[in-house]
């Protein structure tokens, strides 16, 4: 029997015993060695050959990934590892480290219970290390640490043995400081990383060796051996006597939780339904006999089987032919056609999958990434996935040949299903479609895939920055009249306080939670009691509060009011850009008693006009995306690095020096960062290392607003003069 087939059979046996399962993700900053680590772990488990590991990039199965040498999608694989005579099933996801693909990390964190955080011994923790760690802790995913590229400390930085240990200690301290800063409760409850307890390992993924304190005691390889063998270049000795896969996977088995231990804690955070229901009890207990509940974390397309939905099964059992429901879509049954697991790029079919595993199934036509799938007709959905970055750039795409237009629309819908961090706007009338992504690289790869994988020739525009609109002041009792003059709506508009905006972004305030729970969170954040209990709608970071009293017919009209509000928020009055951070209070309503005179054609335009006109009176302004920039350069290039930030309307707010290298930290608007890569290279003679990460939206300076607005309006084919309140409010 082939080794691969044997592995699949062993995996299928172990899947039924959650005690011996570990669902883990590998997370790190770009180029710190995640995929090399994953490949060598797979080689150790016998899934790929050892000669090819590290070069094969098994987890980077996409041609684009191998060509660029980076991971773009999160890849899944199941493997078996033996510890003290007992086999364990390890379901592993390798995630991207590039900031443009952070959405994949967020989704992977929902599927796993533990994470191996990888840090380069020379570079130390970097911005993406911080971001991925924050995502892991937010999802209650427990971390262990692997410090990679230890050989570089010895051979490139020429440190001695003591200095090597000091530097490794500093990396551990820095990661602990991050954990403590993000979640002190978890840090104090045993999540602090401690090399002496075995939650930290050191090594070289490329050369296939690792050490940890427990393994040193067992295997006899000491720090002294590590130092001497690295200096002598004898990596084979280390790989033979202290193999990477054994040290890292032993650490995973001993220190990361199994689904039975993890789910009670995680379900509390990611599902806000009633824990006393049958699905609530089943998920907390990881019960294979309860109702099936699964959260879809990935959608991919298989040329033969169609759409493959991958996700974490929290309770129940999945079998071929089962009927499941996707929450939030029409109540029609989706029948499972195939049930399987992933072994890297290959999907292997199995008879059944039980709770606590990561499943790959076909037949869920209605599912998208983030869907809650269940055998029940009705259940509270899982909390939606919170991405730490937002789309900041857009390209317009058109089909090169008109005959490809229907195919392009279909492909864009597929792409939107596969990658929820993309914003896709399809305009079937003009044939121009917009794709918004996390950055230039993200958009380049998505458009490249449309051409290569989907076979559609497209023409793309230059990237355009995504703006937002918001109000800077307050306006009271703006009146919106319906076209027939029989219905009136009165709103007060003002900025939504920053603390509440942050709670919405963090998923602490949603329309899914119980009203009392939401009210309590809002009260704690300083909102007035009457307002806190009358929240009617949250869209993005905008909130509608109904402060009217005893108005006849309002209940049946509320849905139309919300529809009008959503239309106004989709494109603000200044530049038709999405609105954010707006607090709308409905203060009074006058409705016609005859339902025929207060239908959609009357209510929606009245509300939409009131919000848009009111925003202009309250001082509508533009927000632009800003990125945090970190540039590491030799001391003599410091001036070049700072001027690259300051010359782009940026600010430098920190400088840290280590040895002869200085790291300049600042921020600058995305609009000014086009071509940054080429400019920083030439300014520093190619000696700069840099990275950027999303740092939120900030107000566009007053002196630039008009020019930016006019340019956007011109591009969108709107009238070029600045709009006035009377354009929206009927007098």
UniProtKB/Swiss-Prot annotation:
SMART domains hit by this protein: EFG_C, EFG_IV
Disulfide bond sites: none
UniProt keyword Cytoplasm, yes or no: yes
Localization, UniProt: Cytoplasm
Gene3D superfamilies: 3.30.230.10, 3.30.70.240, Elongation Factor G (Translational Gtpase), domain 3, P-loop containing nucleotide triphosphate hydrolases, Translation factors
Predominant subcellular localization, coarse grouping: cytoplasm
Positions where Diphthamide occurs in the chain: 597
Domain spans labelled tr-type G: 19-260
Example of a GO cellular component annotation carried by this entry: cytosol
Pfam assignment, any one: EFG_III
Record: residues binding GTP: 28-35, 94-98, 148-151
Assigned protein family: Belongs to the TRAFAC class translation factor GTPase superfamily. Classic translation factor GTPase family. EF-G/EF-2 subfamily.
Function as written in the Swiss-Prot or TrEMBL entry: Catalyzes the GTP-dependent ribosomal translocation step during translation elongation. During this step, the ribosome changes from the pre-translocational (PRE) to the post-translocational (POST) state as the newly formed A-site-bound peptidyl-tRNA and P-site-bound deacylated tRNA move to the P and E sites, respectively. Catalyzes the coordinated movement of the two tRNA molecules, the mRNA and conformational changes in the ribosome.
PANTHER family: ELONGATION FACTOR-LIKE GTPASE 1, TRANSLATION ELONGATION FACTOR-RELATED
Protein name in UniProt: Elongation factor 2
Organism: Methanoregula boonei (strain DSM 21154 / JCM 14090 / 6A8)
């Amino acid at each position: 029997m082939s080794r691969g087939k044997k592995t699949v059979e062993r995996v299928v046996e172990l899947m039924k015993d959650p005690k011996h399962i570990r669902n883990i993700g590998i997370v790190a900053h770009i180029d710190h060695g995640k995929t090399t680590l994953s490949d060598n772990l797979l080689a150790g488990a016998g899934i790929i050959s050892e000669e090819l590991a590290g070069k094969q990039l098994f987890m980077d199965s996409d041609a684009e990934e191998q060509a660029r040498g980076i991971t773009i999608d999160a890849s899944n694989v199941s493997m078996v590892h033996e510890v003290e005579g007992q086999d364990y099933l390890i379901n592993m996801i390798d995630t991207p480290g590039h900031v443009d693909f952070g959405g994949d990390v967020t989704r992977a964190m929902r599927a796993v219970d533990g994470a191996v955080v990888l840090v380069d011994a020379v570079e130390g923790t970097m911005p993406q290390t911080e971001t991925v760690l924050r995502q892991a802790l937010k999802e209650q995913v427990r971390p262990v640490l692997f410090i990679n590229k230890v050989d570089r400390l010895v051979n490139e930085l020429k440190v001695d043995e003591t200095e090597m240990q000091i530097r490794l200690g500093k990396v551990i301290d820095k990661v602990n400081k991050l954990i403590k800063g993000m979640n002190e409760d978890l840090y104090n409850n045993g999540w602090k990383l401690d090399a002496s307890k075995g939650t930290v390992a050191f090594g070289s993924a490329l050369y296939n060796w690792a050490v940890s304190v427990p393994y040193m005691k067992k295997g006899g390889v000491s720090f002294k051996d590590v130092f001497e063998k690295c200096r002598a270049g004898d990596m084979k000795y280390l790989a033979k006597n202290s193999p990477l896969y054994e040290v890292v996977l032993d650490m995973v088995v001993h220190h990361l939780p199994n689904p039975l231990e993890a789910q009670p804690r995680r379900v509390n955070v990611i599902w806000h339904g009633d824990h006393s229901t049958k699905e609530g009890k089943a998920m907390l207990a990881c019960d294979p006999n309860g109702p099936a509940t699964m959260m879809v974390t990935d959608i991919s397309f298989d040329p033969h089987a169609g759409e493959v939905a991958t996700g974490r099964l929290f309770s129940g059992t999945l079998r071929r032919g089962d009927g499941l429901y996707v929450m939030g879509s029409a109540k029609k049954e989706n029948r499972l056609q195939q049930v399987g697991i992933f072994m890297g790029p290959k999907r292997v079919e199995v008879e059944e999958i039980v709770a606590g595993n990561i499943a790959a199934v076909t037949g869920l036509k209605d599912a998208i990434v983030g869907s809650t799938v269940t055998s029940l007709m009705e259940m509270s959905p899982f909390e939606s996935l919170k991405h730490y970055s937002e789309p900041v750039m857009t390209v317009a795409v058109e089909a090169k040949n008109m005959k490809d237009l229907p195919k392009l629309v279909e492909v864009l819908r597929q792409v939107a299903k596969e990658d929820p961090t993309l914003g896709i706007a399809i305009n079937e009338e003009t044939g121009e479609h917009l794709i918004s992504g996390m950055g230039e690289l993200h958009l380049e790869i998505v458009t490249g895939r449309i051409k290569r994988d989907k076979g559609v020739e497209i023409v793309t525009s230059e990237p355009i920055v995504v703006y937002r609109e918001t109000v800077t002041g307050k306006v009271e009792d703006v009146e919106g009249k319906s076209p027939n003059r029989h219905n009136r709506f009165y709103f007060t508009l003002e900025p939504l306080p920053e603390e509440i905006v942050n709670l919405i972004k963090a998923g602490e305030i949603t329309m899914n939670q119980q009203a009392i729970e939401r009210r309590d969170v809002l009260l704690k954040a300083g909102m007035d009691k009457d307002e806190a209990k009358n929240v009617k709608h949250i869209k993005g970071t905008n909130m509608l509060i109904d402060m009217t009293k005893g108005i006849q017919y309002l209940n049946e009209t509320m849905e139309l009011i919300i529809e009008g509000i959503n239309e106004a928020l989709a494109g603000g009055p200044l530049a038709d850009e999405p609105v954010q951070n707006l607090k709308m209070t409905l203060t009074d309503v006058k409705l016609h008693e005859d339902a025929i005179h207060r239908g959609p054609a009357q209510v929606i335009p009245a509300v939409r006009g009131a919000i848009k006109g009111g925003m202009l009176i309250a001082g509508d302004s533009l927000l632009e995306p800003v990125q945090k920039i970190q540039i590491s350069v030799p001391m003599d290039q410091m001036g070049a690095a700072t001027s690259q930030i300051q010359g782009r309307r940026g600010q430098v707010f920190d400088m840290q020096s280590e040895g002869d290298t200085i790291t300049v930290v600042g921020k600058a608007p995305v609009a000014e960062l086009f071509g940054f890569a080429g400019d920083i290279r030439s300014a520093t003679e190619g000696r700069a290392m840099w990275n950027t990460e999303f740092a939120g939206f900030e107000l566009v300076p007053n002196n630039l607003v008009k020019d930016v607005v006019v340019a956007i309006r011109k591009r969108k084919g709107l009238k070029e003069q600045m709009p006035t309140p009377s354009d929206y409010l009927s007098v």
